[in-house]
């Protein structure tokens, strides 16, 4: 933040909500809640969540809160379901699912904070002969390029990255030309 302030140029934060700077962000909490609700509606009775470090406000804290909210609405609590924190990678997802399966509390559905984590989960399950979506449903978030390459195809939350990028550019131009408001905008 000090370096940004020292530069003295307009700044727009993209992808994270900021109280200090104008920003364009996605509703990560709402998206995670909706995806966990979909897993539950599809018949999952033993859901799990693989998140990321909660110091990351968007992918960590907000997605965790969304998953918790969906679980609470269905009468569950995060303390009652398998939960792991993983690195932002397929390897992180693989390791987290390996640990969940070793605990003996095998979920029938898992929401992953990112598509890369979900890719690792799918790899782990495939190696162990656990069918997706037959024996376990897997969902990710972000609709990254990897989501369309996986087999089976990944159920994922699609964020409108092009729209948010365009809005961030428009907001930055407005700030540079000193016109328009600098309020935060959700996408």
Question: Where do the language-model regions lie?
Answer:
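Bacterial carbohydrate/catabolite-sensing allosteric modules
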Residues: 5-187
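Central regulatory/effector-binding core of bacterial HTH transcription factors
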Residues: 1-2
């Amino acid at each position: 933040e000090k370096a940004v302030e020292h530069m003295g140029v307009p700044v727009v934060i993209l992808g994270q909500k900021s109280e200090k700077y104008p920003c364009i962000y996605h509703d990560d909490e709402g998206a995670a809640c909706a995806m966990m609700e979909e897993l539950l509606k599809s018949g999952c009775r033993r859901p799990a969540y693989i998140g990321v470090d909660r110091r990351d406000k968007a992918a960590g804290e907000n997605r965790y809160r969304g998953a918790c909210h969906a679980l609470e609405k269905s009468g569950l609590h995060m303390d009652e379901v398998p939960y792991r924190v993983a690195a932002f990678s397929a390897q992180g997802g693989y390791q987290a699912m390996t640990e969940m399966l070793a605990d003996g509390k095998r979920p029938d559905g898992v929401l992953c904070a990112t598509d890369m984590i979900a890719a690792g989960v799918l790899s782990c399950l495939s190696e162990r002969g656990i069918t997706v979506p037959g024996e376990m449903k897997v969902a990710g978030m972000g609709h990254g390029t990897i989501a369309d390459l996986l087999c089976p195809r990944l159920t994922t939350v699609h964020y409108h990255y092009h729209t948010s990028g365009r809005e961030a550019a428009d907001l930055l131009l407005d700030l540079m030309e000193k016109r328009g408001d600098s309020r935060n905008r959700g996408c």
